[in-house]
């Protein structure tokens, strides 16, 4: 009962924050199985797609990578006062950022499967490559955080004239269809990330 009450309150809170009405539900006896479906109608000229990145666009993110990974680790170690735990248990939706960049970003993806793995989806969909400046990536613990999932940040590409101080510039889109990792600090990483199948 307590778990159900907490879950219901969480759904109610989120639906209120994002103004998404809860319009139905179905209860049956059996193993716990929760599915949530959200329907909406997009503004066609403001849809953020994976495709659309152009040669010369800058690759950006808006926060440190690896925060959720650190939160999970702290949770497993019993560090209940860690500020990173909420990044793992209660990730914030990037709706406001999405709205902010919807008219300037040429492509976009969330980083739930790991920054480099998800960036690869943009590059493949856009038929381009990238130079990634490893020294510029704001990581939480170490450079391997760029392969950590569950961060739910947005990785996006934008032309130079739309850059903002609040964006971390981590690379540049290139015509060459490969990914070149650049580091003067000697960082050496492989592109991994979560694989669904």
Provide a role label for each language-model segment.
Residues 69-87:
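Short, compositionally biased
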Residues 2, 47, 160-166:
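Short, conserved charged micro-motifs
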Residues 1-73, 172:
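Glycine-rich anion-binding loops of enzyme active sites
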Residues 36-49, 82-100:
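Active-site glycine-rich loop that binds ribose-phosphate moieties when present
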Residues 27-28, 64, 113-114, 135-137, ...:
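Short, ordered loop/turn segments at secondary-structure junctions
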Residues 88-151:
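Active-site-proximal betaalpha loop/short-helix elements
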Residues 89-92, 164-197:
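Acidic, Ser/Thr/Pro-rich beta/coil linker or hinge segments at domain junctions
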Residues 39-41, 155-159:
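Short hydrophobic/aromatic beta-strand micro-patches
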């Amino acid at each position: 009962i307590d778990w159900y009450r907490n879950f219901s309150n969480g759904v109610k809170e989120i639906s209120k924050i994002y103004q998404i009405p809860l319009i139905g539900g179905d209860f049956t006896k059996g193993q716990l199985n929760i599915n949530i479906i959200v329907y909406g109608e997009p503004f066609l000229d403001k849809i953020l797609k994976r495709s659309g990145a152009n040669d010369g666009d800058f690759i950006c993110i808006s926060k440190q990578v690896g925060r959720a990974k650190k939160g999970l680790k702290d949770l497993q170690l019993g560090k209940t006062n860690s500020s990173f735990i909420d990044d793992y248990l209660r990730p914030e939706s990037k709706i406001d950022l999405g709205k902010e960049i919807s008219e300037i970003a040429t492509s976009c993806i969330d980083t739930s499967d790991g920054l480099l793995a998800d960036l690869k989806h943009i590059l493949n969909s856009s038929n381009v490559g990238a130079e990634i400046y490893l020294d510029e990536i704001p990581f939480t613990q170490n450079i391997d955080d760029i392969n950590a999932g569950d961060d739910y940040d947005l990785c996006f590409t934008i032309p130079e004239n739309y850059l903002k101080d609040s964006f971390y510039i981590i690379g540049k889109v290139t015509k060459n269809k490969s990914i070149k990792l650049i580091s003067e600090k000697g960082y050496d990483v492989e592109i991994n990330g979560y694989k669904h199948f």
